[in-house]
């Protein structure tokens, strides 16, 4: 296997700080770390997140992935001047093969003296709670007084929302410090332990104030002499409270002390070997063509790994992974449809774990269906750890009325129920895992099928599915959306097949499923091969979208039209019928797929 490539940041710019903090993020599925710089910048958003750790900040808020105290930040002062970048010679790259982020800078102070500042860090693939960082400083042409301040900075928030109370901070000996933090609802604890070791003759002291626990290291260097600081961080969290806080914190600290017996390079070697084995089974190699094709594939696979909580079936993959706070860290249908297939064909145990996440949250889905007057299971459009609905109530401002617009997805974008069932069937057909399909899979298929059977409404002599939103979220509250209806039928048909195959004794369900399949009305493919998106889409006017396709930014059409106006035009936000062709290719001819795509 050839070595996976790297991703380089071409130059330093304060305008792209957060872009590259996401693109070059690191992680292992247990925790995610944004690629923020050690030094502070006003526009920079730091972030570190644990899969499954959500909290609601207060009344009117929703559960979101908690931004943890920062451990990357370092204030570096050389001869009293604080290090900050502008246009220095620099190199920064993320190595996909090892997950290591490296940066090298030649920095000149205001009086012209030069210094090489190099940093590297990785999130361990071998020991999930471990982060290792190293920074070296070398004066090039003059002696220097260097001061490095780093530790645990608990002033971090989720865009101003604070989720953690500082429960306990403490220093142990000359190198160890620990902060224990508790979510404000008292349900979860986070222990962050740090070990900072510095080469050479240095002086050190600690401060703990204003939610910052810091170690300050000062060194006197001659030109050409290097000071190296290695920082190890161990992060544990819990929501069970089985052990006393001190006992639990001490156990976490002991794990860090064991890691500290090894050097940065030794720890990196173990993590890199874990990555090597992972890549060996999964890397896709492109022969010929543009070199960027290989980089794009390596990038995609790298992020697929670092966003997937393979260690914990009570967590799933957030829409933005663990790279930031977009979508509050919530789980959508994207997981089952776009991400699970990769794991299904590379490591089916991970796909099984992702499906068991939905199975664990089945009671919440059943309760949501019941509250809305339906049977079976209606999974939340956005979910976190509990399985409850987490979709915000409001979104953007209506440009016509000036009022906030309600998010309709949680009320009507129900196709995710069938999407989850589709993923169950994909897993079953690929693995033949009878123990899963007979238990968790059967429960998911039957409860999702029961939802669709109760969700349909009778119109004369047939059943229809009304008031839904398909994958295209610019077309809301329509009847007989093709994607939804076809997927619902597939859901019920496969649930019926599995029920019969495994001897389901629920005769009432079998009868109702048979009647649903017989009576459900499906939109038909037109003579030109096009499948209408819903009952009304083809009758809506079309407008010239060239202006909006060319515009920078996202959803710029909403600067000219309200959502209600867009809803009455032939405008798609996401693939809908084309997505259906992808999901159920055996039900459509190649000619029809091409007609819909055009």
Regions flagged by a language model, labelled:
Residues 1-26, 31-327:
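Acidic/polar, glycine-enriched structural segments that form the non-catalytic walls/loops
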Residues 299-306, 357-364, 443-455, 490, ...:
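Alpha-helical scaffold segments in carbohydrate-active enzymes
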